[in-house]
Amino acid sequence: MIAHACTFAPIPCPLPLFGARIPAGFPSPADDDLEGTIDLNEQLIRHPAATFFLRVQGDSMTGAGIRDGDLLVVDRSREAKSGSIVVAAVDGELTLKRLKIAGGRVWLVPEHPDYAPLEIQGEMGLVVWGVVAHVVHSF
């Protein structure tokens, strides 16, 4: 739970970025050319004051490549559109789902066949906390 807003000023941390693209198919000779540096803060955090991180618990979004234990980079400044993966509170309970808006109706849709979509109806309270911008996945 986020109790209050805080100012986030990422500290630059440039890391080496090699110019070669790595084939995911057949192997090719290694290329030792350093293209420059990359700062993960710059790559992952577009709006520092509106960004927060959450760790995933559960398997309802595995079809979207989001697994138990993954780290989410969530951006509150992004517009939640139909098709966005969002962190939302439904009647005060947090959830991670794909937002679907069609015909004036709203659903939170899991990406796993064992879970049913949740249609937001009547008195149900829905608050979108933010849109998932990136997923950090470890093996």
Regions found by a protein language model. Name each.
Residues 69-70, 84:
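Structural motif
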Residues 111-122:
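Low-complexity, intrinsically disordered Gly/Pro/Thr-rich segments
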Residues 50-51, 81-86:
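Short, hydrophobic/aromatic-rich segments at coil-to-beta transitions
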Residues 1-62, 93-94, 101, 105, ...:
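Short, positionally conserved secondary-structure boundary motifs
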Residues 84-86, 96-101:
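Short beta-strand-centered aromatic/proline hotspots
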